[in-house]
């Protein structure tokens, strides 16, 4: 049985003081959660959030990392730096990183392998654009993105050390959402793609839905058999909203 995982991606929002207050407000609301709860904050908030979540069931996540251990990479952060700040999860390959900052399937793979090697759990994002879905490329594209990202990992690592997030790009920040059935079907396709290379590891890897999940649609999406959680954007910026997504089964 795969344990659900709900992760909030705060993107470029919240100062350290605001971040600490948000998780303090959130903690009592999700204390009895049946799923893993993660907040992926801007790096400037790591220290404040790590302190605020002590003694709670909330885990700290980052929004990106470099694959090198150190070096002349201005503006980048290494896995060891993240771990030293209390980070346990890291979002990799988000559509906004791909769109605005030149991330490619190849660099997402480098980051994914480096994260696993360092003992971080990557949340690897894959998904299609609107025109790609309309052209019928969705299934081939998401399987390709997933398998490239996982290249170099063992079946055991894929099963236990990686989370996949299916985020249809056309549903990011648009208010549009894949239907429950569309999301479930595509995540099932991703799982079968993983099975084609990694066998039964596909039954253990957790795959989230990441396209405008919110308090209103979380219950229906999470009722789908293939969907193991959500990567939550806007709805993670308010404690009450995020707690309702986390409490999808309440």
Predicted segments with their positions:
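Active-site loop-to-helix "anion-binding N-cap" substructures in soluble metabolic enzymes
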Residues: 1-250
């Amino acid at each position: 049985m795969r344990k659900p995982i709900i992760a909030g991606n705060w993107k470029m929002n919240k100062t350290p003081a605001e971040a600490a207050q948000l998780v303090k407000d959130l903690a009592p609301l999700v204390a009895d959660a049946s799923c893993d709860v993660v907040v992926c904050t801007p790096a400037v908030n790591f220290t404040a959030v790590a302190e605020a979540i002590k003694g709670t069931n909330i885990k700290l996540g980052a929004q990106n990392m470099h694959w090198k251990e150190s070096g002349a990479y201005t503006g980048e952060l290494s896995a060891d730096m993240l771990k030293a700040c209390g980070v346990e999860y890291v979002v990799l390959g988000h559509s906004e990183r791909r769109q605005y900052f030149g991330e490619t399937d190849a660099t997402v793979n480098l980051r994914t392998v480096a994260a696993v090697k360092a003992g971080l759990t990557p949340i690897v994002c894959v998904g299609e654009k609107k025109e790609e879905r309309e052209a019928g490329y969705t299934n081939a594209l998401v399987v390709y993105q997933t398998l490239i990202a996982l290249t170099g990992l063992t079946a055991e690592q894929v099963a236990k050390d990686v989370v996949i997030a299916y985020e249809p790009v056309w549903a990011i920040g648009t208010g549009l959402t894949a239907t429950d059935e569309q999301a479930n079907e595509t995540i099932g396709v991703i799982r079968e793609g993983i099975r084609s290379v990694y066998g039964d590891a596909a039954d253990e890897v957790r795959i989230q839905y990441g396209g405008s999940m919110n308090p209103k649609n979380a219950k229906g999406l999470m009722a789908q058999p293939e969907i193991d959680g959500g990567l939550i954007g806007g709805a993670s910026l308010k404690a009450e909203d995020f707690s309702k997504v986390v409490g999808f089964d309440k």
